[in-house]
Amino acid sequence: SMGSLNIRQITTIVNTFKNNWSGAIGIHAHDSMGNAINNSMQAVNDGASWVDSTVTGMGRGPGNAQTEYLSIELDSYRDLDTNKTKLFKLIRNHFKPLKGQYGWGINSYYYLAGKHNIHPTYIQKMISDTRYDEEDIISVINYLKEQGGKGFNPDVLETARHFYSGNAQGTWKPE
């Protein structure tokens, strides 16, 4: 889904599995557009029996449903109050420094990629490469939005980097 599913789509998917599958149903939600927790909880509400998550959403690019947030929501859903002290201590002592070092998690570029069904690796590559400034990243996203970017291809990234779709301005003319 590239992280772009919404709760209505989750309900449709879970119901399709419930009607055609006798095994357990679960969800692994990406957080490109900040929907991972809501989508995970919708899947639980619709009958999913397991939910995948990672501490602080750790994962490639925008990451996944965050275990700490999911734990809070599941407690509310099940009217529980589990002790989260050890989890929060683990986050503060180990995962927060790792997240700072490796920079996973949602941002505006991943959100746009999710919205336009663009593979998150394009964003991951651009934000880790100093050749790309904000205008370059937006230009590449716009190119991929029009040309398609569901699967990552480094050659397409290079082509998109040099593609300019705006109106040229200036007075210089070759002689």
Language-model-detected regions and their locations in the chain:
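Catalytic cores and adjacent flexible loops of soluble metabolic enzymes
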Residues: 1-175
